[in-house]
Amino acid sequence: MQAEKNNKLDWINNLIDSFRLKINDPYRKVDVVDVQQEARLSHLGIVPESKRFNTFLIDIGSGNTKGGFFPYGDLNTFRLFQLNWGTKSISNATEKRCENDNSLDNYNRQLSKVLGGAENTDIIYAVNSSGSYKLSDNIAVSGGAAWAVANLTHPEMTDNPIVPVTYKEVEKLFEKLYNNFDALAPTFLAQTITRSSEREQAIKNIKAVQKVFDQKSLMAGTGLLLKIMRQFASAYETKQFFLVKNGSVGWISAYVDQTVEN
């Protein structure tokens, strides 16, 4: 279990005891959701039932990436996908390599090396070993990086919880993040949106993204997303990529539904 690996069992047990005390029910059964269950529940909560068995879900977190898919056309087996890389861990590894040169140019050089290493040693193997390429027509990506990229590539889609993107669109965004960050200013990005209410919402969304992520962390998250997407971008077969804006609530909603059913 992930908590055991991180030596957090005592912390979790204390949290459960505190919860029982607060609700005045010392014998209440409290289930701990492990990484396998969380990834499975995320799939059930995020991916529409019509696309359940041909969609590979990937959640890019701050310290790691996880996800998976149902390989046999039923809910009995869920194949887990895991990477020990996330937006923050990529950024931290890059900054460590920068040493005393904190310039954007050096950050970009070191980021390229970190991402290249992650791709060659982890990402390619994780995708290939999952067997997801042949079985998945759709690649859905959730997490903070996906939320950020969705709002920056398609600010006009304010009411869409799921945003379709192409590899080229995300690649173009990365180039802007490095070479022309001013072009991603909220008012500039939203200027082509004609309806004022939608334009104001788009500006609000972009400001929220840039409040959470600075330029360098956006480069790290977008770069990691690109490396993952690259494994599914082929001249011979087209995969559909989707970015999920509110993926964090997915596994929770599925967990609640499952609990009610049981």
Give the residues covered by each predicted segment.
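Acidic, divalent-metal-coordinating active-site segment for phosphoryl/phosphodiester hydrolysis
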Residues: G63-G67
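Short glycine-aspartate micro-motif
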Residues: T55-D59
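Helical "lid/coupling" subdomains associated with nucleotide-phosphate turnover
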Residues: A3-N13, D17-N54, F69-P71, T77-N262
